[in-house]
């Protein structure tokens, strides 16, 4: 079997790229080790929650995907309040100030995945999907790439796109070097029902034990991410539901009153990943395979969707290109994405180091910085414009 492009990894970013190339003259294969998971019939909530920027929502809308998500499972954010760790410092951002109807949207991973896979499986057109398929070897040669599957099938391609996550097997096979360090933190995620209405406000607290974020869900519900050191994270995941709810409520200064746990807490390790290059001849990296950032800014998925948008525009613009794995063509993608990725890596890593420091002088100045920025509309406006764009 031969294709122009083979995407390895069918998560949100990989499936989005496949969908964005649907209907083009390109022949595309999407390979994923897992099988598509149908949405549950009950009203339960997914622990994996994404903050989707207006730009990402517009991109998904242009693909005909955003409109298909169940509107009752999408919550707009109208305001965001951020607090320092001295009990007084804070900064707030509002949609009204940004000139937009909302700052962002909150929705579940499984809602997005269901829409993406539905679009691919129900009307595949030029896309061939290999689900429950494991890649075991890749061999590069001058005229293309061979991918060997565990069942013995061989797939040929002009270009491989690695979209297989932060511990990318494709990246390793390509020999791309990585700057990779653990933050020695776990992101503890869970969903709660709340006593008080959230009024579509997102909250974030920079605390001495980490960063706690509240994202609004429909009705009186929130999703939380508590990025904290490993010992504390393990403790939080092993106490009773009642005690965990109490701890989160106290850490948030009871801003939404009493909390009741509605999904069991889960945890994921936090890592910084910077790749030496995004492309090689016949290879492109996108999403978490191309970058790994701290979740304190909630921008990981948006960074990946911007990868998808840039790459799909380049590939579709050159649909009659003689060789989609040509290094000169692929360098256009790297040039288009490098500055954005580097800036986001630098900002999120810097913020983590700044707010993770226990130095009393640094603590004083970071809290002062929050307060002063909140009092300077011009600077705050510039920060908002950069984040929203």
Please place each PLM-identified region on the residue numbering.
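Conserved N-terminal helical subregion
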Residues: 74-173, 181-186
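N-terminal FAD cofactor-binding segment of flavoenzymes
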Residues: 44-84
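C-terminal helical "tail/cap" subdomain of flavin- and related membrane-associated enzymes
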Residues: 313-389
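N-terminal Rossmann-like FAD-binding beta1-loop-alpha1 element of flavoenzymes
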Residues: 3-30
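FAD/FMN-dependent oxidoreductases across multiple families
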Residues: 232-327
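Conserved FAD-binding catalytic core of PHBH/FMO-like flavoproteins
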Residues: 60, 146, 159-258, 262-265
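Conserved Rossmann-like nucleotide-cofactor binding loop
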Residues: 13, 36, 167
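Glycine-rich FAD pyrophosphate-binding loop
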Residues: 22-45
């Amino acid at each position: 079997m031969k294709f122009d492009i083979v995407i390895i990894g069918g998560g949100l970013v990989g499936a989005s790229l496949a969908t964005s190339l649907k209907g083009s003259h390109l022949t595309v294969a999407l390979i994923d080790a897992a099988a598509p998971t149908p949405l549950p019939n009950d009203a339960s909530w997914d622990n994996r929650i994404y903050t989707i920027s207006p730009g990402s929502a517009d991109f998904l809308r242009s693909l005909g995907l955003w409109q298909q998500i169940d509107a009752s499972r999408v919550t707009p954010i109208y305001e965001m309040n951020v607090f320092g760790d001295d009990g007084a410092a804070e900064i707030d951002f509002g949609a009204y100030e940004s000139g937009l109807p909302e700052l962002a949207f909150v929705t579940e991973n499984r809602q997005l995945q269901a829409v993406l896979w539905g679009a691919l499986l129900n009307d595949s057109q030029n896309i061939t999907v290999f689900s429950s398929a494991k890649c075991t070897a890749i061999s590069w040669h001058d005229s293309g790439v061979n991918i060997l599957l565990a069942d013995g099938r061989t797939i040929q391609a002009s270009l491989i796109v690695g979209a297989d996550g932060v511990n990318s097997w494709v990246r390793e096979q390509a020999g791309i070097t990585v700057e990779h360090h653990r933050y020695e933190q776990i992101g503890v995620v869970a969903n709660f029902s709340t006593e008080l209405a959230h009024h579509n406000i997102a909250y974030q607290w920079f605390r001495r034990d980490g960063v706690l974020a509240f994202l609004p869900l429909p009705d009186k519900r929130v999703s939380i991410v508590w990025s904290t050191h490993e010992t504390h994270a393990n403790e939080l995941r092993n106490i009773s539901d009642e005690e965990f709810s109490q701890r989160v409520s106290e850490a948030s200064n009871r801003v939404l009153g009493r909390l009741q746990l509605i999904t069991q807490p889960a945890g994921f390790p936090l890592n910084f990943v910077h790749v030496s290059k995004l492309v090689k001849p016949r290879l492109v990296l996108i999403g978490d395979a191309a970058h790994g950032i701290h979740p304190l800014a909630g921008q990981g998925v948006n960074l990946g969707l911007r990868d998808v948008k840039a790459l799909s525009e380049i590939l579709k613009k050159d649909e009659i290109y003689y060789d989609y794995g040509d290094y000169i063509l692929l360098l256009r993608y790297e040039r288009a994405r490098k500055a954005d990725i580097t800036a986001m890596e630098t900002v999120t890593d810097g913020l983590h180091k700044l707010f993770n420091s226990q130095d009393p002088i640094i603590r004083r100045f970071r809290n002062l910085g929050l307060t002063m920025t909140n009092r300077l509309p011009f600077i705050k406006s510039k920060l908002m414009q950069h984040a929203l764009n």
